[in-house]
Amino acid sequence: MSRFDFIQTSLPDLMLVQRKAAEDYRGFLSRFYCIEAFAEAGIKKPIVQINQTLTRKKGAVRGLHFQHPPHAEIKLVSCLKGEVLDVAVDIRRTSPTFLQWHGEILSAANRKSLLIPEGYAHGFQALTEDCELIYLHTSAYHPDAEGALNVTDPALSIDWPLPVIDLSKRDQNHPFVTNINFKGVTL
């Protein structure tokens, strides 16, 4: 029996992963990742880096980050504490859903993860105080390959459920797609 359900979202290749827990009177065991199960779902690149974030303020937003090829990455994002709206934006130049976004509520309670493919930008908004996320990456961080879009860009029309607060200076300064004539990434 697989410990995961892989559910296709409204955007191509972007998947919601529902983790199934084994529960008993002591609590539960839940897998975040299993190389065999993910390979069966078509994800064959190895995990090479794992990051954890803590976002203290409700309404705070991080993102929208991505890495340019050849360091484009798949990310598996899960919430360890609190609740977030996790958002992925399709930035693949030739995609029929170019610049469209999809969001999912992730929480420790719902045991959902978002599997974000290469060619997507990622960000999230904390819906509670003290949110902790864990990210599994198929590429290490390369500052020279870093890219980002502005979370408040009207061209993206992301429907953040709370007022956007506590945006880092760095994230505030990310460009709007129209200001830089953003053409997307080619994988």
Residue ranges and their predicted role:
Residues L106-E129:
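Conserved metal-binding segment of the jelly-roll/cupin
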